[in-house]
């Protein structure tokens, strides 16, 4: 049976009550709620449940694709893999996006913040094997669980746009795009040497090979030749590289640099070394960025898969054995760079194109067949790798670049690497002696090109993207293999090719091969029996275009609706980890250009702005066992003593009362048992506190060191805000003041009576409007998410210390509280919106408060008085007072005058800040 799951109905986070407050909350209805600020203590669980139920009911975060008077804003965090449980990295990532989304809504934007699920992948397959359950069932159960957890965070997500990439409704469109690209020649199939993971039985991209091992299994990677489908990403290499210029200042510079290096455009010369083999003339073609060193070539090296190596293998068992050994290694450049350089002489030679001398051909493990022609010219005197190899095998080393005397002075004692790799004038190069790089390049090209022995060439480090994976849980590749017609694409009307979802894999290869009803089909071309392709797409294919599908997730006739895409794309702010710099982010840029060329989207880039958030770290606690192994313990199982700075100084295991070692602060991980369950933390402190903590503790783009003890700070702050609001509400009730009148004055600065305000009331208004302006700048211009929390805390302190002694001062206090709550609702939406509603405001229609410039004007300022640089007093004066008057006033102050016993040498006035009197002796 072939069947598939659809996303289940959205789980309601709140099941025990319906919201009791309408959207238009009045003073009367606010007081009837069981969480009234006049009658109850701060209870985050009740408040957050009520607000989440309200948001689910009124669907205020759903947005339309129809034209709007409001400007649009698309905020997106990289969507999660449905592992089943949120971790604190998720919490931080999605809180960042949500804070920005809520801020821009208050600023008058129509904000789309969607959520979906990166549903395909190896973890689901592994879990299915372990639990003997279909990956589809495991995946969609996890989606239901994680959706509920995300809703507990109070994220302002448009859930109507939700999808999972493992649903046919989604992946049919990447199958469709694959067919369009196949028609254009941008998809092709070839036999390729690949990284093969012998445990997971799949091909790995170079980026997925770490220290010669598979990134998931940890198995040593082998080389294997298999047929694979490729996306011709190199056709877009120039555009991918050049368009990075558009992203300067909008993306982190390190990500741009990583992509530039990964694409790796090199300008140089292709040189042909002629040879004869078995009576036939041919040439060994090599690419070099240093043709000025051509006269220093003393050997050439080829990959084990190169035709010359294969020829030599057929005639020499030792060479055959060496080539076989090379093929077992990784094909990732990073691994080859770290591996020991080894090789074997083939006994073959090629002719140097300039000197006519015979040059030996070696097979070397550091040469990749998949890069360039699979051959390199070796210049040991001027290349570190070649020098290492030549020294090891006693090959000639010929200097052809002049080496400055200072170079030898800089060489550290005991450093055997004497290759000089800089550019300089040529020596020992015959007619090219004395030339610099450019001159030698031109002269050699002029001599060799007419003989068809060289040509200018641009080469890329980037290689075409192999997307075939020998896994079950992925999107089927829509191709058919026919005995008569060969490889044939599936007809568009037969899409999607649906993946069977009732399969329980056993870990031995791809189970699709063993499902006759999936494999057996008819050839679209000749109608004869044929077999479906059983490879599935690399899961990076799904994540390369999901951002665009969010614009029109329910469109059944288009991959992306052009009108919707024009409204929402590009993504205004994308948020995710820097570890995706050269995989997901590069592939998404590539796919955007592919979709643009299919007239599905406009513009050249998918993400206008990128933020790479820092990792969440936590302390580790462990014991070293007698056998040398290490056991790590969860913090919940440890009693920890902290010093005054919040650092752990003593840790005791609860179960036996014995000490454990306090380890390093490291990235949260299962292996170190130092992860923190967001659910437990939310249950204890509430989601608002967790949100505040994750953004207040460190800048969003830097690492966050988690501390359970430090959560008390944001929690106490939220409780303080609750107390301030409660006391203010009681004062309003006692004064019999109308909330409608107060709110009108707060939301309309012109309606606020500011005549004759006390000094304290003016100071509170000034602090309020300074905070409004600062947070607006921090979020809207600087993308600084931690400093606004500090500003809110400072404003709350001012409010807490302010005592209103009149109706006018109660109005000032009300204004400050309302503005505080509006800004707080960006970070802590549950308490912020709840208190605003209790105070009679409709949170759906609220805007970010406007700065009242008149409130920033100071009637009096406090200036510091110094004598010889030491503070001796203060004085309140009018701003921009006359400097001479300030000097006289400062000298006259009793606390200052006693320090002026000597001759006054100098008086310095720093306008509106200080007066410094310099006295002799």
Swiss-Prot record:
<keyword id="KW-0067">ATP-binding</keyword>
<dbReference type="InterPro" id="IPR014729">
    <property type="entry name" value="Rossmann-like_a/b/a_fold"/>
</dbReference>
<feature type="binding site">
    <location>
        <position position="670"/>
    </location>
    <ligand>
        <name>ATP</name>
    </ligand>
</feature>
<keyword id="KW-0648">Protein biosynthesis</keyword>
<keyword id="KW-0963">Cytoplasm</keyword>
<dbReference type="InterPro" id="IPR009008">
    <property type="entry name" value="Val/Leu/Ile-tRNA-synth_edit"/>
</dbReference>
<dbReference type="Pfam" id="PF09334">
    <property type="entry name" value="tRNA-synt_1g"/>
</dbReference>
<keyword id="KW-0547">Nucleotide-binding</keyword>
<dbReference type="Pfam" id="PF13603">
    <property type="entry name" value="tRNA-synt_1_2"/>
</dbReference>
<dbReference type="GO" id="GO:0006429">
    <property type="term" value="P:leucyl-tRNA aminoacylation"/>
</dbReference>
<dbReference type="InterPro" id="IPR001412">
    <property type="entry name" value="aa-tRNA-synth_I_CS"/>
</dbReference>
<dbReference type="GO" id="GO:0004823">
    <property type="term" value="F:leucine-tRNA ligase activity"/>
</dbReference>
<comment type="similarity">
    <text>Belongs to the class-I aminoacyl-tRNA synthetase family.</text>
</comment>
<dbReference type="InterPro" id="IPR013155">
    <property type="entry name" value="M/V/L/I-tRNA-synth_anticd-bd"/>
</dbReference>
<feature type="short sequence motif" description="'HIGH' region">
    <location>
        <begin position="80"/>
        <end position="90"/>
    </location>
</feature>
<dbReference type="GO" id="GO:0005524">
    <property type="term" value="F:ATP binding"/>
</dbReference>
<dbReference type="InterPro" id="IPR015413">
    <property type="entry name" value="Methionyl/Leucyl_tRNA_Synth"/>
</dbReference>
<dbReference type="Pfam" id="PF08264">
    <property type="entry name" value="Anticodon_1"/>
</dbReference>
<keyword id="KW-0030">Aminoacyl-tRNA synthetase</keyword>
<dbReference type="InterPro" id="IPR009080">
    <property type="entry name" value="tRNAsynth_Ia_anticodon-bd"/>
</dbReference>
<dbReference type="InterPro" id="IPR002300">
    <property type="entry name" value="aa-tRNA-synth_Ia"/>
</dbReference>
<dbReference type="GO" id="GO:0002161">
    <property type="term" value="F:aminoacyl-tRNA deacylase activity"/>
</dbReference>
<protein>
    <recommendedName>
        <fullName>Leucine--tRNA ligase</fullName>
        <ecNumber>6.1.1.4</ecNumber>
    </recommendedName>
</protein>
<dbReference type="InterPro" id="IPR002302">
    <property type="entry name" value="Leu-tRNA-ligase"/>
</dbReference>
<dbReference type="Pfam" id="PF00133">
    <property type="entry name" value="tRNA-synt_1"/>
</dbReference>
<feature type="short sequence motif" description="'KMSKS' region">
    <location>
        <begin position="667"/>
        <end position="671"/>
    </location>
</feature>
<dbReference type="InterPro" id="IPR025709">
    <property type="entry name" value="Leu_tRNA-synth_edit"/>
</dbReference>
<keyword id="KW-0436">Ligase</keyword>
<dbReference type="GO" id="GO:0005829">
    <property type="term" value="C:cytosol"/>
</dbReference>
